[in-house]
Amino acid sequence: MNAVFTHRLARRADIPALNVLMAASIRELLRDFLAPEAVEASFDVMGLDTQLIDDGTYFVVETGDVIAGCGGWSRRATLFGGDHTAKRDAALLDPRQDAARVRAMYTSPPFARRGLGRLVLGLCEQAAAAEGFARVELAATMAGEPLYRACGYAPIERFETDTRSGVRVPLIRMGKRIG
């Protein structure tokens, strides 16, 4: 039997479940792309940015009462990272010149490769376009890059980000025109 998926905006009450989902996603979905120490180091630079929930720009995808995936977009300057990540910037972007950010895309491992990422990306792109943004950018993990390429995102730059352990985590800044 196929699961029926619905989506809605995330609420603060979802935070505990989102943190569990994100941890499982990082641990399981990155392991085919990164060395074990880089997977663990990824927790330093990935996770939930609750500003997205507060801004009303973070979506959850559910089946029944289970959150199967999540992700959002932002009108703020931060490109990636959770509440605990250094160098976050809450400055508002100008849709006339800046790209909106797609942020914190995660799928619960049992629901991977079932179209949830594509669904959330579409929701993010529609919402950003409705606010006047003509472009979106994101920081892709190695595991996420194939999805983003398939959805029309092009690499802008490859980079590595520092972590507390000294292990550098590879990411790819990617972008797409939406308007």
Where are these regions (language model features)?
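Conserved N-terminal entry element of GNAT/NAT acetyltransferase domains
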Residues: 1-16, 179
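Conserved GNAT-fold acetyl-CoA-binding loop/helix
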Residues: 23-48
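Short loop/turn motifs at secondary-structure junctions and domain boundaries
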Residues: 49-55
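Conserved acetyl-CoA pyrophosphate-binding loop and the N-cap/start of the following alpha-helix
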Residues: 111, 115-123
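Conserved acyl-donor/pantetheine-binding loop and adjacent beta-alpha core of acyl/acetyltransferases
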Residues: 55, 62, 68-112, 127, ...
